[in-house]
């Protein structure tokens, strides 16, 4: 496969470089290889960490799942299942003397199945502590959750549960089981958080889906939240891993207990936040999942960005969903991807989400997420795609799973003129179970295309940047080459429009 990939890249450079016509080397639909890719592991809400100390990749996810690999295409399961015999944690299920529940579940208790729920871990290396910090959540209902901290001496674990950091879903009768009054003071106004005896979940967050990261100055932060009151942000103390509670500033969306309000609220379907800082663009990028996570739930990945870590985070239109406009939340956020199918895929992809972003061994940015399929099941697998920076500073995803790193990774192409048959997928803003099938179009060297879609395009000289005009929308993106999941050589572009929709185009290349 490595030799084939290298030959394909050399062919692409020969046929497509220098602004030449691209249809001479195209692969017909009938001759395409087709496949159903299987990664061999099952991790929901995956986070990937490249650990330079061991030169390995570690992937952790919901239900105490974990995998490890020497590269991005071959992960092996290491941990699986919420049970004491799973050695991801050394002490998570230990019950303190005199107590009835393990400490991590002291507030949330057991779930409806009378078991324990452990969701969405995310790991960061803390240089101050010299420890790997795992932030994760325990939960028992759609609002009753605790954000927790565990530590380890290696990325592989085992992790030692340290403490509960934050809780949601409390009532007047249960708030004393949390640190709310310890943080906010004995005279804190509980009625701002509890109404008619119940937690105001449309206003305040569900304490799940934590994601730690470093800002441009090396300070540690954690974003978190799911549905409920939206996505929030708190700074972290590098000496302890604990949260730093800010001074309250209600006029600017800052709460003493829960921190900085970023996007969402009103119990709308926005969850799984992840923030990454890109020094090349000097932007912070906030990725979230919209919709319901089931195969037919319309799950999808959206993107916002900000010049400041605490926001405001906005989309291509300079907007974001909030407590006032949340009923139309699907209009906001650049859509990274949703349900789609290309002709080389035997089964359509559905409900991508639960994403995180990381820098690989090769220095490239990648996005990892769980992927469901149009096969009548709720089976899912992790997928890793390359991320690129557009000329105007948005991050866009490659259409296919990675097939290599470094010299064998997908790479940008400069000074080409797309021509021949291209398959276009337009990721629309609706939250739906509908699959966006690739539309066949013909590109010509005069800068136009026609077929199922008709429009125009320009490629900036001596650069990978492409601009596509389609249905009154301007898409800005990049051109790249690589290999699809079936092993076909491809030229593709990935772009985001000024209407927040994204556009993928794929040209299949004969070898």
Description of each model-found segment:
Residues 5-6, 14-17, 76, 96:
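Generic low-complexity, intrinsically disordered sequence content enriched
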Residues 11-27:
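Sec-dependent signal peptide cleavage junction
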Residues 1-9:
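Sec-dependent N-terminal signal peptides
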Residues 23-511:
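Carbohydrate-active catalytic/glycan-binding domains of CAZyme proteins
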């Amino acid at each position: 496969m490595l030799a084939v990939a290298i030959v394909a890249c050399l062919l692409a450079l020969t046929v497509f470089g220098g602004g030449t016509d691209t249809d001479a080397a195209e692969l017909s639909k009938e001759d395409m290889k087709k496949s159903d890719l299987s990664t061999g592991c099952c991790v929901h809400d995956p986070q990937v960490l490249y650990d330079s100390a061991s030169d390995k990749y570690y992937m952790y996810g919901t239900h105490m799942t974990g995998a490890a690999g020497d590269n991005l295409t071959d992960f092996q399961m290491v941990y699986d299942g919420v049970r004491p015999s799973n050695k991801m944690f050394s002490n998570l299920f230990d019950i303190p003397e005199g107590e009835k529940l393990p400490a991590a579940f002291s507030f949330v208790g057991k779930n409806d199945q009378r078991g324990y729920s452990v969701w969405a871990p995310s790991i960061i290396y803390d240089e101050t502590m010299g420890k790997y910090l795992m932030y994760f959540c325990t939960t028992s209902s759609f609002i009753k959750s605790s954000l927790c901290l565990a530590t380890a001496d290696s990325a592989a674990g085992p992790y030692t549960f340290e403490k509960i950091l934050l809780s949601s879903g409390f009532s007047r009768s249960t708030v004393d089981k949390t640190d709310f009054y310890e943080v906010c003071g004995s005279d804190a106004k509980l009625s701002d958080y509890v109404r008619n005896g119940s937690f105001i979940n449309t206003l305040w967050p569900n304490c799940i889906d934590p994601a730690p990261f470093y800002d441009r100055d090396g300070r540690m932060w954690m974003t978190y939240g799911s549905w409920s009151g939206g996505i929030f942000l708190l700074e972290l103390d590098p000496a302890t891993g604990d949260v730093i509670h800010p001074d309250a500033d209600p006029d600017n969306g800052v709460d003493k207990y829960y921190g900085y309000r970023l996007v969402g609220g009103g119990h709308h379907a926005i969850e799984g936040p992840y923030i990454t800082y890109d020094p090349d663009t000097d932007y912070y990028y906030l990725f979230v999942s919209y919709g319901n996570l089931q195969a037919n739930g319309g799950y999808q990945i959206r993107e916002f960005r900000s010049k400041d870590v605490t926001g405001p985070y906005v989309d291509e239109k300079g907007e974001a969903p909030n407590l006032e406009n949340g009923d139309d939340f699907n209009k906001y956020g650049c859509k990274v991807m949703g349900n789609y199918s290309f002709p080389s895929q035997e089964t359509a992809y559905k409900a991508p989400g639960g994403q995180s972003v990381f820098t690989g061994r090769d220095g490239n940015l990648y996005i990892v997420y769980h992927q469901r399929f149009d096969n009548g099941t709720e089976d899912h697998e992790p997928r890793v795609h390359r991320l690129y920076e557009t000329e105007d500073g948005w991050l866009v995803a490659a259409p296919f799973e990675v097939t290599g790193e470094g010299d064998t990774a997908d790479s940008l192409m400069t000074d080409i003129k797309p021509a021949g048959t291209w398959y276009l997928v337009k990721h629309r803003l609706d939250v739906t179970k509908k699959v966006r099938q690739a539309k066949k179009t013909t590109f010509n060297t005069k800068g136009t295309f026609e077929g199922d879609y008709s429009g125009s395009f320009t490629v900036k000289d001596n650069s990978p940047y492409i601009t596509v005009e389609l249905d009154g929308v301007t898409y800005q993106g990049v051109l790249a080459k690589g290999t699809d999941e079936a092993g076909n050589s491809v030229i593709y572009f990935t772009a985001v429009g000024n209407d927040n929709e994204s556009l993928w185009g794929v040209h299949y290349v004969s070898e």
